[in-house]
Regions:
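Long, highly charged, low-complexity intrinsically disordered interaction regions
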Residues: 61-79, 89, 417-515, 534-561, ...
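Duplex nucleic acid-engaging cores and interfaces of nucleic-acid transaction enzymes
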Residues: 49-52, 59, 63-318, 324-422, ...
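Generic start-of-chain signal for non-secretory N-termini
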Residues: 1-19, 26
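A glycine-rich phosphate-binding loop feature that marks nucleotide/adenosyl-phosphate handling sites
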Residues: 177-184, 319-323, 377-382, 401-408, ...
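Single-stranded RNA-binding regions, centering on S1/OB-family and related RNA-binding modules
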Residues: 542-707
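Structured, non-catalytic alpha/beta "coupling" segments that mediate domain-domain communication
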Residues: 73, 87, 100, 226-239, ...
């Protein structure tokens, strides 16, 4: 099987699209670049499909490397037959490869190995021929100092046969399929743990069982976590009536004494060798699927968070609320630069509301503040109420933003580099303000795992999680585009083709030489070659460039075509931009070439209509119910405004203005059946919910969605 055939079997994509995509990837093209500017080559594949191709190619390479290792190992042992080589070379399933390698794998000495050393393999072969009538008589021929009795000889032969059965690729493959279809996962409380307070969060798994292939991902991960923490014991089993008859049918071809002997051996092989092995495999496979689902949920949440509505270039006063240590206040200009910082003490124990009001009022006037951003942590509701009570001399919108990860950012190297002369409290408040202005630009500075929108994020495969989250950030950054003259090093590093080192070079060049006046100036950055320029330039915007196309998602390679389009239309390029009437008259067939296809040209016209359009909507102000500030204020039947602050596979959590977010279970999202929570709600969506349950002991709030 070629790599193209393998990838096609994994992705169900056309061979030509796969070939062209791999060719572009080999040339050093990035996934965002290929998805946006090489649609005609890939047959309009999106980033997810291209990532799938790249991953499948990596899987193919890993399988081929594993084959080489297996073949080399068996050959060194002098046991590689032509038939075995052919079976290994024709296999492209890792499980099957490992099954084929199992008899030749280096391992600890087994019962079967000892029996073979004692000369009992010929006895085992004779029994397996099933042409024997008297087992004890036959076993008597193999007695020795190490095997003094017929019983021990037969036991040794049984151990050898049990291992042969365990190494039978057909039996292993069939059992694997039976387990995949019919395995039951069960859990029971670990000895002495049922009374422990910490264990109570897993109480539902103290005596639990269900079909493994029906268990939702979050439940699989919850059970695995409970086992890891020592509170429960897990088992994955199939009724032996589903497995032993199949094995006996394939092994036993005789009757009488030999059949009875082999029946016991089959059972021993299954219980001692096969069941534990296949059970572990099946559970690992279930975990892998659960990991993939959890990672997918996390990535979708992160994407929604990164693409959250920005307020835009406004003057913002940001407040990081607090009680005893006060509320940290900073003022930011339109570019997010720090203008002023202070501390106010409107809450207990100081309760200095008069001075706090005076300071905020004068600061809003002095710095021409247009919006106030309040962190949603400790003392958030009280601070919001206090701010809204102030009669500012001009209209100022008030927003509450998530401060998850702000403390992580404030202590990070990035924050220290940005604000070397300020402490963590000022840096944290700046982050809260910048999140309102442009969530994407600020959140890329923080490890996504610190943002708090993941489901079982510490339980899943960490390398796969990082890979998917990094890919998500790259997708979001390149979807929006980046201002070349204001973007931070962190933001630039995610732009197609750039990376951390080149981002440093760009920022250093910008600091030394001033703002870029046009995209082409990017070529002056040290070590930024033609390939990086090709991959990156269209994702970078230069406002007020002498060429208006530099502030769009149009690639410079399209500029000559656009210039010709404008000329053929009888107007300038500047007049063509945004001119729907003129653009509608353009016949793209006139501009098609071997290298420029119809999909590319359609995208050019679409971008010309609305150049540089930000796919994000503008931020809207929101207010919680002023009468609900603590958990004790929440009552069953209340209808409350809220903001979706986390999405999981089993529902969504809604911030209703108290410390504890309420859960809207997937069954409470709407009247109809819901298979995917993301089809109904989005992260940070403003909603109305009704309280249906308040658990005072566990401090849990259950909600149902109204809108």
């Amino acid at each position: 099987m070629t790599n193209i055939q393998y990838i096609k079997s994994q992705t169900q994509l056309p061979e030509k699209a796969i070939e062209n995509t791999l060719s572009l990837l080999t040339e050093g093209c990035t996934i965002p670049f290929i998805a946006r500017y090489r649609k005609d080559s890939t047959q309009n594949l999106d980033e997810v499909a291209i990532e799938h191709i790249a991953k499948s190619q990596a899987d193919y390479d890993n399988i081929c490397k594993r084959k080489e290792t297996i073949l080399s190992s068996i050959e060194e042992q002098g046991k590689l037959t032509d038939e075995l080589r052919k079976r290994i070379e024709n296999s492209f399933e890792l499980n099957e490869l490992e099954d084929l390698y199992l008899p030749y794998k280096k391992r600890r000495k087994t019962k079967a190995d000892v029996a073979k050393e004692n000369g009992l393999e010929p006895l085992a072969k004779q029994i397996m021929s099933q042409r024997v009538t008297d087992l004890e008589l036959l076993a008597g021929r193999y007695l020795s100092d190490k095997v003094p009795t017929e019983k021990e000889a037969l036991q040794g032969a049984s151990d050898i046969i049990a291992e042969w059965i365990n190494e039978n690729t057909f039996i292993r493959r069939t059992l694997r399929r039976i387990f995949q279809r019919k395995a039951i996962i069960s859990s029971e409380v670990a000895k002495g743990k049922n009374e422990e307070e910490e264990a109570q969060k897993y109480a539902q798994y103290f005596d639990w069982e269900e079909a493994l292939n029906k268990a939702p991902s979050h439940r699989v991960l919850a059970m695995l976590r409970a086992e890891k923490e020592g509170f429960v014991k897990l088992k994955v089993q199939v009724d032996s009536e589903e497995t032993l008859p199949f094995m006996e049918e394939n092994i036993i071809k005789s009757r009488g004494e030999v059949a009875d002997f082999l029946k016991k051996t089959v059972k021993d092989s299954y219980k001692r060798l096969l069941e534990p092995s296949i059970s572990n495999e099946t559970l690992q496979e279930a975990k892998d699927k659960a990991d993939a689902k959890a990672i997918s949920v996390f990535a979708e949440n992160l994407s929604q968070l990164l693409l959250a509505s920005p307020l835009g270039e406004k003057r913002i006063l940001a407040i990081d609320p607090g009680y005893r240590t006060g509320c940290k206040v900073v003022c930011l200009d339109e570019k997010g630069d720090l203008l002023h910082h202070d501390v106010i003490y409107p809450h207990a124990p100081q309760n200095d509301m008069t001075m706090a009001t005076k300071k905020l009022s004068s600061t809003v006037s002095q710095y021409n503040i247009q919006a106030i951003s309040i962190g949603n942590g400790t003392a958030s509701r009280e601070t919001e109420s206090f701010v809204r009570s102030i009669a500012f001399p001009k209209k100022v919108e008030v927003f509450v933003v998530s401060e998850a990860g702000a403390s992580v950012y404030s202590a990070s190297k990035i924050a220290r580099d940005e604000f070397p002369d300020y402490d963590v409290t000022v840096r944290g408040a700046v982050s809260i303000g910048r999140r309102l202005a442009d969530p994407l630009a600020e959140l890329v500075k923080i490890d996504p795992k610190s943002i708090g929108v993941g489901q079982y994020q510490h339980d899943v495969n960490q390398s796969l999680l990082k890979e998917e989250l990094d890919a998500t950030v790259v997708r979001c950054v390149n979807k929006v585009g980046v201002n070349l003259n204001t973007a931070s090093k962190s933001l630039l590093s995610y732009v197609s083709g750039i990376g951390e080192k080149m981002a440093e070079n760009i920022v250093a060049y910008r600091s030394a030489n001033g703002a870029f006046s046009k995209r082409e100036d990017l070529k002056k950055v040290p070590r930024l070659g033609d390939k990086v320029y090709q991959q990156a330039v269209a994702f970078l915007r230069v406002h007020n460039s002498e060429n208006p196309l530099d502030n769009s998602a149009l690639h410079p390679e399209a500029y000559p075509i656009i210039k010709q389009m404008a000329k053929d239309t009888g107007i300038s390029v500047a007049q063509l931009i945004g001119n729907k009437q003129a653009i509608a008259t353009i016949d793209i067939q006139k501009y098609k070439t071997d290298k420029v296809g119809e999909l590319y040209l359609k995208d050019v016209l679409k971008e010309l209509e609305k150049p540089g359009l930000d796919p994000r909507t503008t931020a809207k102000a929101f207010a919680f119910d002023p009468n609900v500030k603590t958990f004790d204020d929440v009552r069953i039947g209340m209808i409350l405004p809220g903001i979706v602050n986390n999405i999981t596979a089993f529902g969504c959590f809604v911030d209703i203005g108290v410390k504890e977010s309420g859960l809207v279970h997937i069954s409470q999202l709407k009247d109809a059946y819901v298979s995917d929570v993301n089809e109904v709600v989005k992260l940070h969506q403003q909603v109305q919910v009704k309280v249906i349950e308040v658990d005072q002991i566990r401090k849990r709030i259950s909600l149902t969605m109204i809108i």
